């Protein structure tokens, strides 16, 4: 069965065309909700932040250190991809096809290349009620990890997908999700890690090279939760 799914859900497939193959890190077992934010760290509470406020909380080159260059933001894409062989994504298809799954109106995003290569790390911030954020991102991760293997066709290019649930870092935020995605097209294979942390009314998603995601996740969450 085929289902049309918005690239909001599977936009990360573009990484296959940009990121060279990288080895997988050691992985955990099942993702679980994590306890509330670390002791002594600020939390977002119930305040819903504007997109402009979220933009100021994104990491920048100074936060990341030498070797990182922010990529220009591309215009929003409304193309869709075809998902083959994944019932979990089939069930999500109606919602995703309208762009509703991560269509939170208050959001900000930044993507960076590293050391002049195609290796990337990206950060997304969203703000809404805790319930909406939790249900929205939870539905996406459940669907994307609901099938160990499936295929997407993006821009006429067939891409083999393999997904693996990971245990999110403990002690970060109120809830956490993490997954490892392997993209295969022809002779090329790329591994991308994606970790999401919800803290109150704020949702952080860091995606990209597994090593870079692990390196910058804590820093991204600290800045996202910092009060001015």
What are these model-predicted stretches?
Residues 161-223:
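A short, solvent-exposed beta-edge/loop patch
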Residues 1-10:
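Bacterial N-terminal signal peptides that target proteins for export
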Residues 23-106:
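N-terminal "mature-domain start" segment
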Residues 51, 55-61, 65, 134-141, ...:
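Extracytoplasmic/secreted envelope proteins and their assembly/folding machinery
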Residues 48-50, 121-128, 206-208:
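Second-shell loop/turn segments in exported
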Residues 58, 62-68, 72, 144-151, ...:
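Sec/Tat-exported extracytoplasmic proteins
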Residues 70-183:
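A small/polar (G/S/T-enriched), proline-flanked helix-loop surface module common
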């Amino acid at each position: 069965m085929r289902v049309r799914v918005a690239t909001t859900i599977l936009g990360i497939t573009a990484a296959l065309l940009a990121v060279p193959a990288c080895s997988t890190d050691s992985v955990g077992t099942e993702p679980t909700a994590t306890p509330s934010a670390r002791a002594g760290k600020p939390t977002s509470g119930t305040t819903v932040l504007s997109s402009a406020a979220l933009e100021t909380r994104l990491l920048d080159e100074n936060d990341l250190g030498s070797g990182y260059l922010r990529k220009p933001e591309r215009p929003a894409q409304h193309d869709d991809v075809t998902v083959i062989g994944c019932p979990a994504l089939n069930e999500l298809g109606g919602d995703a096809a309208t762009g509703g799954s991560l269509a939170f109106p208050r959001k900000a995003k930044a993507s960076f290349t590293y050391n002049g290569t195609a290796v990337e790390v990206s950060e997304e911030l969203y703000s809404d009620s805790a319930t909406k954020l939790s249900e929205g991102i939870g539905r996406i991760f459940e669907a994307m990890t609901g099938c160990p293997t499936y295929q997407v066709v993006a821009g006429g290019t067939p891409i083999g997908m393999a997904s693996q649930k990971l245990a999110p870092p403990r002690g970060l935020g109120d809830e956490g999700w993490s997954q490892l995605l392997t993209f295969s097209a022809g002779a090329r294979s790329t591994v991308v890690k994606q970790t999401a942390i919800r803290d109150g009314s704020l949702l952080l998603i860091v995606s990209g090279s597994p090593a870079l995601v692990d390196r910058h996740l804590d820093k991204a969450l600290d800045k996202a939760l910092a009060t001015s």
